[in-house]
């Protein structure tokens, strides 16, 4: 693939089939949240339901019996969690596809200096020699505008994504802690991070997912003046490469862990079991169910925005690297 073809591949990579799946998941999550809110208001209504509420519920095809309304509310939350599970897969696939494109840009740079891309020994076998060659050659420098993500922000986005996804998945009793032991990932997601936590009841599900959802809330809109720069130095060049490679490993681990149909069935069966075991009248458990439904909208929004920001920032920056490489080839 030529440099021009690589640039076109990266530029065209903004929209994908994964975006369609992401929007479908977001739609299901929002519908489930609305269904829960309506059924929950009936199930928790103090005293007898007034005729106006009974009529409205009937028109909306909702039960007017409080016990049945509670079952509908719980089912809506379970369906929302199922859609959120699918959202985690769809966003991870979009992220992985992006990292594959961006790593090809670095591989193209390596080829220029006779350095083969080494996935097994990324740092010592590929990136460190590439950084030395690039710095010696004076390839990096000024850009036409602020189009290159600052290395520290790229790393922070990836760290937030890794931690956030680990905690979201722990709400389903699943873990990607094995990926945090990777030597490159450990440079970004630091201190041997673990998202694995015990799940005893729905309060644990809510707590873990709330933690993860908040960790994903990294600057929802990247600002060109704050997060980007109009030059590329060797530190940011290296930090971006490490961040992209770490992100590729994290997203791949998410897909492998979540992508098996039997894994989802087991996870959702456990969620259903927790709902069945939830004590009637336990206000803390009831509040957790409500918080899961309300929170899922915010968590899904954070995940979608961070996914878009990461893939967009990587696309912008990798495109600039290829432009520098193309200019370098023309000048020689």
What are these regions (language model features)?
Residues 65-69, 112-332:
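Long, low-complexity or tandemly repetitive, helically biased scaffold regions used
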Residues 102-109, 328:
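Membrane-engaging insertion elements
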Residues 78-105:
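Extended amphipathic alpha-helical scaffold segments
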Residues 98, 109-112:
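Charged, long alpha-helical segments
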Residues 1-85, 109, 118-122, 129-132:
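Intrinsically disordered, low-complexity terminal tails
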């Amino acid at each position: 693939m030529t440099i021009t073809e690589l640039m076109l591949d990266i530029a065209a990579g903004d929209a994908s089939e994964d975006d369609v799946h992401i929007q479908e998941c977001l739609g299901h999550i929002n519908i489930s949240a609305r269904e829960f809110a309506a059924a929950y208001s009936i199930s928790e209504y103090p005293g007898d339901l007034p005729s106006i509420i009974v009529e409205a519920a009937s028109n909306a095809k909702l039960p007017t019996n409080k016990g049945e309304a509670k079952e509908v509310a719980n089912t809506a939350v379970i369906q929302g969690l199922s859609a959120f599970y699918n959202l985690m897969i769809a966003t991870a696939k979009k992220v992985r596809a992006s990292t594959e494109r961006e790593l090809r840009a670095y591989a193209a740079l390596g080829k220029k200096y006779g350095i083969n891309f080494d996935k097994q020994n990324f740092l010592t076998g590929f990136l460190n020699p590439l950084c030395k060659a690039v710095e010696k050659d004076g390839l990096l420098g000024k850009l036409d505008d602020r189009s290159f993500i600052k290395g520290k922000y790229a790393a922070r986005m990836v760290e937030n994504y890794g931690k956030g996804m680990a905690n979201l998945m722990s709400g389903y009793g699943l873990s990607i802690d094995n990926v945090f032991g990777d030597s490159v990932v450990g440079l970004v997601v630091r201190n041997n991070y673990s998202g694995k936590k015990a799940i005893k009841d729905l309060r644990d599900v809510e707590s873990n997912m709330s933690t993860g959802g908040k960790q994903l809330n990294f600057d929802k809109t990247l600002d060109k003046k704050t997060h980007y720069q109009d030059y590329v130095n060797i530190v940011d060049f290296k930090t971006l490469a490490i961040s992209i490679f770490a992100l590729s490993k994290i997203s791949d681990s998410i897909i492998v862990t979540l992508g098996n149909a039997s894994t989802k069935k087991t996870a959702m069966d456990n969620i259903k079991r927790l709902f069945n075991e939830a004590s009637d009248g336990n206000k803390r458990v009831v509040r957790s169910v409500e918080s899961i439904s309300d929170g899922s909208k915010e968590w899904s929004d954070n995940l979608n925005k961070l996914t878009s920001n990461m893939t967009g920032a990587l696309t912008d920056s990798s495109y600039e690297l290829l432009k520098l490489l193309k200019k370098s080839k023309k000048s020689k």
